[in-house]
Amino acid sequence: MTDNKDDKTLSVAGKKTLTLKPSGVTQGTVRQDMGRGRTKAVVVETKRTRGPLKHKDERPITPVAATPAARPAEQRPMPPQPSGRPAPQPQPHQPRQEQNRPRGGVVLNDLSAGEMEARRRALAEAQIRDAEEAKRRAEDEVRRRREEEERLAREKEEAARRAAEEAARPPVEAEKTEEKVEAASPAVGERRAETRPQPGRAAPAATPAAPDGAALRGRRGTESEEDERRRSGAGAPRGKVVRPEPAKPAPRAKGDEGRRQGKLTLTTAAVDEDGSQRGRSLSAMRRRQEKFKRSQMQETREKISREVVLPETITIQELSQRMSERAVDVIKFLMKEGQMMKPGDLIDADLAELIAGEFGHTVKRVSESDVEEGIFNISDVDDDMQSRPPIVTIMGHVDHGKTSLLDAIRHANVVAGEAGGITQHIGAYQVEQNGQKITFIDTPGHAAFTAMRARGAQATDIAVLVVAADDSVMPQTIESINHAKAAGVPIIVAINKIDKPSANPQKVRTELLQHEVFVESMGGEVLDVEVSAKNQTNLDKLLEAILLQSEILDLKANPNRTAEGTVVEAELDRGRGAVATVLVQKGTLTPGQIIVAGDQWGRVRALVNDKGEHVKAAGPSTPVEVLGLSGTPAAGDRFAVVESESRAREISEYRQRLAREKAVARQSGSRGSLEQMMTQLQTSGVKEFPLVIKGDVQGSIEAISGALDKLGTDEVRARIVHSGAGGITESDVSLAEASNAAIIGFNVRANKQARDASERAGIEIRYYNIIYDLVDDVKAAMSGLLSPERRETFLGNAEILEVFNITKVGKVAGCRVTEGKVERGVGVRLVRDNVVIHEGKLKTLKRFKDEVSEVQSGQECGMAFENYEDIRAGDTIECFRVEHVTRTL
C-alpha cells in the first residue's frame, strides 16, 4: 500500500470517495484499443499469489511483453540469394497505435510452473503446425508445376494438330491464313510469354514479381510469428483483453504496378502492349474458315425430301418444323397464294398437303379415328381357322310362335317369363344337336323392335323365318325378310302351328313367292320345314336343316386370338352393375381381359352363360354375359379386346367425344340456310311432351324411343329428356322436376328415395311391362296437348229490310229470313257487298214485339247486335253455330 500511498490530508471538500484498498493487490492503468484509432483507459488490478518458494536451480522466467506484428512494407526487400530462398528479415515496424499507447502503470507478475509448461506446449504445437503448413505449401507447389507442364504439353499437341491442318489446306487459302496469323501471332506470343510462369527456373533479379513474392513470404513469416506469440499470450498481463490485430497487407513501393499488370480493360482489350492494333485470334480465324466451308457446302447441298405426317388440323409453325423448313418461307408461300396468315394459325390437312408438296415433301395423312386401327377386322391365317357353331336368328311376325319354337328346342319356358307373352328382349341361347352346338338369337316380332331385328340379322349366319300356317305372311314377316336379305344371310322357312285346323302351309309358300322367297317345293333353294312348337313336331328336321346349311356355309373362326364380337343386349343390374350380353364371333374371351364396347370399356370380371353358370372362357359363336364394364353400351355395338387400359381409355374417350359432337351438330343443325330457318319457325310452335324413361335393357329403351317418335305430329311430339338402363333413382326425379317431365319405368321400379322425392315434388311415376300399354298411354296424354278442333255449322241467312232507331235499345234491323233459320245467342256475321263487316252475337231477336228463340225461313223478325250499330238496309246477316271437338293422335 506504500506504493500508492497518498500524502494528501483527508478532507470532505473533494469529490473522492473514501475507500479501503485490499492488501496484496497492485493497481495500474492500461490503454485499451477500441479500434479505428480510439483508446480507453482501463484500471488493472493484479493480485499476488502466495505460493511455495522456488528451488535454487529453478530460474525465474521474465515474461516478455507482447511484440506487435512487424510490417515489412517500409523498405524494399533485398533480392533473394541464388543459393536458396530464405525469407528476408524485415525491420520490425511499430504500428501507430502502439507508439501512441502509454506504457506507464503496467505491472507484470512472475509466471508459475504450470503456466510456463502450458506456454511451452503451445509453442511446440505452433512449431508443428508451421512445419505442416510448410510441407503442404511445398506439395502445392509441386502440384502446380505438374499441372503447368501438362498444360504446356497439351498446347504443344494443339499447335502440332493446327499445323497439320494448315498444311492440308489448299495453297491459296493457306497463304491468306498465314498472313493473318503472322499479324496476330506476335501479340499472342508476347502475351503468353508474359502471363505464363516458367517452372523450374529462378526468377531474375530485375523481374518485379520476385521482390513481391519475397515480401509476401516475409510477411507470411512475420504474421505466423505474431500469431504464435498471440496464441501463447507472452507479454500480455493476466486479465487483459487482447484484441487481435487485423493482418495488413505490405505496402507497395511507388510505381509498383504488379497487381494491375494482368488486368483486362476495355481500353487494353483491343490494343497490344506496344500500342499497335490487336489482330484476330486463332480461334476467330478458325471460326471464319469453318463458316466459309459451311457456306460452300450449302451451295451444293441437295434438297432432302421428307415424309410429313399430317393430322386433320395443324399450325403453320408445327408444319414447318415437320418439314425442317423455316416458318417464314411457308408464310411467304401463303402470301403469294393470297392468304395472310401467322405461324400460330391453324390450317386444314388439304392446305398443309399442298404446302408440303410445294416444298418437295411427301405426305402421310392421319386422323383421330386412327386410334381404332388394328382392333377390328384382323385377318387370320387359314391354318389357324377351326370350325365354329352356326349363329341362328329366329325372326318373324308377332305371335307367330318364335319364342315358343325356341322353347321347344331348348326344352324350357321362356314365354312365361315375358310380360304379356311377347318377347321384348333379344335372347341368346346355345343348344346341342347330335354333338354339334347351335347358337340361337331370339328377336322381338312387333313393330317397335325393328332395330333389334336388324341387329339380330347383322350378327347371324342363318335366319329362320317363322310364319304361322293359319296367319300367313304379315308386315313384320316382310320386314324380317328384308333384314335377312340386307344382311346377306340364307333363310330357312319354319311354317309353325300346323297342328291348327285352319293351317294352310301351301298358302304360306305361295305368298312367300311375292317377296322373292322361293322354297324348294316351289323350285327354289330356300329350305322349308313344317313344325309345331306346341306338339314339338319336326323339330329335329329343323335342326338338321340348320346344320346342313351351316355345313354348306363352312363356318370357321380362329379361337387362338384376341376376342371380337357384337353386343346383343346391355342392362344395368342392381348388384352386378353394367351387364352386357355379347356374342363372341372371333377369338376367345376370358376373365381379366380389357375390352372396349362402343364408348364404354372395362376389365372382364366374370363370364356367365345362358344357363346362369360362370365360365372360364367363351369361344367363337358363344353368347355370354360380361360383367365389369364402366357403363352400358348400346345394343349392336361391336366389342374387342385391347392390350392395355390406356389404349381402351383413349378409344372410349374418342368415341364419347364423337357422340357429343354429333349431338351438338344435331342441335345446332337447325341454324344455317333459309330452308332450315323456315323449318325452325314451323316447329317453334310445336308442343312437347317431356318424358324420363328408364328401362331394364338398352334395346327396350331404343324400341320405346322409336315408337314414341312415330307418335309425333306437326303440333305435338314426345321429347325424351333422359333415358337409360336401370332403376329409377332420386336424380331422375330431380331431373323430371326441373324439366316438368313424366317418369316412365319399363320393367324397373323406383327405390325408396326416388319414391319419397316424387311424392314431395308431385311427380307421377308410371310403371309398365308391356310396350303396347306404354305407347297407348303416352298417345292419350299427348292427345290432351292438342288444341281442340273448331267446327262451324251454318244455320241460315237474313236480309235487312229496314233499320229502326229505338230509344234505350239502339238500332234494330227489320229482317226477313231468306235461308235456314236464325237462333238467338249464336254467332252472326254482318255481310255488306260480300265483305264481312262485323262478327259477333245477337243481343235480341223479336217477332211481333215478343222475344223468341228462333225464327224460321220466310218469316220477318227484328234483330240487334251486341255492341255494334253500323247496320244498313240491304245488308245480309249470316247465322252459324261454333263447336269445339277434342282431337286424338
UniProtKB/Swiss-Prot annotation:
Which species does the entry assign this protein to?
Answer: Rhizobium meliloti (strain 1021) (Ensifer meliloti)
Q: Return the Low complexity bias intervals.
A: 61-76, 196-215
Matches recorded under CDD domains: IF2_eIF5B, IF2_mtIF2_II, mtIF2_IVc
In alphabetical order, the GO MF annotations are:
GTP binding; GTPase activity; guanosine tetraphosphate binding; translation initiation factor activity
Q: What is this protein called?
A: Translation initiation factor IF-2
Would you identify the family this protein belongs to, as annotated?
Answer: Belongs to the TRAFAC class translation factor GTPase superfamily. Classic translation factor GTPase family. IF-2 subfamily.
Q: Which InterPro entries match?
A: EF-G-like_DII, EFTu-like_2, IF2_assoc_dom_bac, IF2_II, IF2_N, P-loop_NTPase, Small_GTP-bd, T_Tr_GTP-bd_dom
Q: Where is the region G2? A: 421-425
Q: Which keywords does UniProt give here? A: Cytoplasm, GTP-binding, Initiation factor, Nucleotide-binding, Protein biosynthesis
